């Protein structure tokens, strides 16, 4: 990463082409092909930003990864019986390798910008670097503290895909590198249907599976662009500007939201700022969805709704349907976000009071923000993964029959604990218990079918230790603390628990990718 900084610290006359020379470095492609790095964006603490990192260990990692890739490519070439067939796909192979390396390179300036932003915030507020805000679970306590006094929520599905040329223009406003812009346009030609107004979903799926890092970078750059305009209008229309959520957003998302915007926005949108006078407003985005919560009338929420539709249609040239934006009442409609169903509740508390000889009752309405587990999508995910039928009845996992007993149990336990860990914040644990029951019985049936036995005989042979494998860490700890008072531990376990160590839960939230959990 020291070489990265050398390229980024060039003088003004050379800084316009700081990305292009990195394309000729072999270690860039070694890093791009490393499977550990492909699962997520580059971590700031593991690639050289931390002073404690060893440059020698990084060089060894790059060399080892590069040698492994050479062996993989040689084995593919040796096992291919048709050399012409292999040569015919060289162009696609080279394009794939180049795009993966390019995805690593374009992240560098934004990662350095994020580091400098966090350092400035730490100096201003004299606060230590906290990793708790990186957790996805930190959003829900924020909901509980701030959403209880709000009324309406604007539930938005962010439109995709967008026109490729819009992505190029967005990237052009950040990086003054003509060579990189031409290369980006070339990659978009490869993956997208350039002639159509709306990109087909097949191109998106191919792009996402072939180069997820590059796809996520383009998606986040698109999100940054419209959020910059949105936050600008939000700050200009309110005298009570929010400062508490700035650091939270910066640490959750890899790409920082820069506060300096072009002054032309003020000239273009000055006439419509009076439409959005709302001092209490909260915005949260994750993956392809965002929510906008406010304490105001439905009229104002409708204005925001049509503003967002016009912004995407006219500024980003995206066909946006009104059905992708829903105005929900916080205390009447559920909000499906981050794998939870959230809703506000009004709990009435009756208090008897007496003053002198007169006694009267006072009804206090306590507002509470509840989060529950969506059982139907999870049942559907288990059905797709062949753990149960559409009715939720457990079935055996036939594809794992060739594995050893310990390996089968370990895979079931891992899925069960991951789901319990993430959904521990649910207000009602009955749905979570049902999911755990399906996985436990499916494990029984898979082992029974493998050994051609019955559930009763097989369970008697394994004993109760087999059931303890499915206990979560919380249940183990509570059973140790309260070994004799089991009812106390069960009562404590029924409470909601939010964890601040859950950083990457894409596969847990996205029910269509449930099968990935078992790998």
Curated annotation (Swiss-Prot):
GO terms for molecular function: RNA binding. It comes from the Eukaryota. GO terms for biological process: mRNA processing; RNA splicing; tRNA processing. Its main location: plastid. Keywords: Chloroplast, mRNA processing, Plastid, RNA-binding, tRNA processing. GO terms for cellular component: chloroplast. It is found in: Plastid, Chloroplast. InterPro entries: Domain_X (IPR024937), Maturase_MatK (IPR002866), Maturase_MatK_N (IPR024942). Pfam families: Intron_maturas2 (PF01348), MatK_N (PF01824). HAMAP family: MatK. Belongs to the intron maturase 2 family. MatK subfamily. Usually encoded in the trnK tRNA gene intron. Probably assists in splicing its own and other chloroplast group II introns. This is Maturase K. It comes from Aesculus pavia (Red buckeye). The lineage of its organism: Eukaryota, Viridiplantae, Streptophyta, Embryophyta, Tracheophyta. The gene is matK.
């Amino acid at each position: 990463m020291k070489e990265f900084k050398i390229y980024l610290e060039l003088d003004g006359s050379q800084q316009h082409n700081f990305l292009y020379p990195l394309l000729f470095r072999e270690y860039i492609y070694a890093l791009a092909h490393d499977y550990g790095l492909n699962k997520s964006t580059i971590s700031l603490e593991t690639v050289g930003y931390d002073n404690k990192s060893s440059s020698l260990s990084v060089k060894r990692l790059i060399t080892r990864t590069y040698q492994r890739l050479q062996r993989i490519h040689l084995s593919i070439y040796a096992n291919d019986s048709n050399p012409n067939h292999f040569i015919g796909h060289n162009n696609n192979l080279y394009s794939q390798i180049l795009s993966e390396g390019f995805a690593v390179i374009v992240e560098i300036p934004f990662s350095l910008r994020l580091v400098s932003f966090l350092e400035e915030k730490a100096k201003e507020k004299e606060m230590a670097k906290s990793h708790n805000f990186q957790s996805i679970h930190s959003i829900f306590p924020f909901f509980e503290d701030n959403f209880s006094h709000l009324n309406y929520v604007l539930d938005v599905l962010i439109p995709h895909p967008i026109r490729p040329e819009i992505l190029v223009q967005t990237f052009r406003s950040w990086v003054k590198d003509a060579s990189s812009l031409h290369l980006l346009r070339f990659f978009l030609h490869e993956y997208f249907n350039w002639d159509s107004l709306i990109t087909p979903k097949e191109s998106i799926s191919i792009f996402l599976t072939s180069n997820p890092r590059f796809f996520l970078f383009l998606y986040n750059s698109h999100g940054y662009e419209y959020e910059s305009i949105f936050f600008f209008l939000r700050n200009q229309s309110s005298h009570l500007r929010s400062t508490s959520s700035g650091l939270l957003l910066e640490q959750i998302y890899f790409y920082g939201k820069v506060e300096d915007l072009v002054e032309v926005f003020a000239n273009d949108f000055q006439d419509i700022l009076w439409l959005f006078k709302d001092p209490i407003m909260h915005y949260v985005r994750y993956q392809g969805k965002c929510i906008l919560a406010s304490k105001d009338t439905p009229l104002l929420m409708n204005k925001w709704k049509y503003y967002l539709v016009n912004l995407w249609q006219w500024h980003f040239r995206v066909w946006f349907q009104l059905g992708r934006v829903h105005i929900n009442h916080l205390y009447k409609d559920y909000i499906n976000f981050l794998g939870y169903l959230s809703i506000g509740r009004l709990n009435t508390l009756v208090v008897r009071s007496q003053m002198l000889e007169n006694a009267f009752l006072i009804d206090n309405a306590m507002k509470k923000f509840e989060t529950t587990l969506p059982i139907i999508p999870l049942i559907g995910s288990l059905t797709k993964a062949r753990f149960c039928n559409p009715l939720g009845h457990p079935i055996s996992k036939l594809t794992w029959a060739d594995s050893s007993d310990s390996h089968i149990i370990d895979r079931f336990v891992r899925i069960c604990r991951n789901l319990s860990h993430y959904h521990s914040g649910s207000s009602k644990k009955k749905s979570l218990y049902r999911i755990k029951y399906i996985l436990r019985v499916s494990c029984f049936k898979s082992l029974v079918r493998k050994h051609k036995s019955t559930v009763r005989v097989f369970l008697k042979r394994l004993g109760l230790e087999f059931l303890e494998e499915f206990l979560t860490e919380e249940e183990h700890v509570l059973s140790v603390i309260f070994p004799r008072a089991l009812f106390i531990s069960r009562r404590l376990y029924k409470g909601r628990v939010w964890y601040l160590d859950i950083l990457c839960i894409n596969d847990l939230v996205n029910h269509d990718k449930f099968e990935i959990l078992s790998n």
